[in-house]
Amino acid sequence: MYSLELSLRYSPFPLSIQKKEFDDVKRIYDEIKTAMNETLESSNLIELSCDKVQDKLITVRAKEIISVQIYEKSSVAGGAKRPGFSLDID
């Protein structure tokens, strides 16, 4: 299961959805990136659905999205890989 997480302007809590296939979540990620670049002239709405919770729908304005990330949820006891970025300083 893959999670796609959105950070919104003026919101301390991220929104997330889960998809079963990486190709599905990557396609949505690319669509959101494109919409974020096009929001200078207009304010597009983006509707997202979740595979884990079938009735979950989220609609957001593209111009309010600050960041988007993908991470894989693991089914092992550890739960999920930690979202975010790692910085290796040698």
Curated annotation (Swiss-Prot):
InterPro entries: UPF0367. HAMAP family: UPF0367. NCBIfam families: PRK13683.1. Belongs to the UPF0367 family. This is UPF0367 protein P9301_01411. It comes from Prochlorococcus marinus (strain MIT 9301). The lineage of its organism: Bacteria, Bacillati, Cyanobacteriota, Cyanophyceae, Synechococcales.
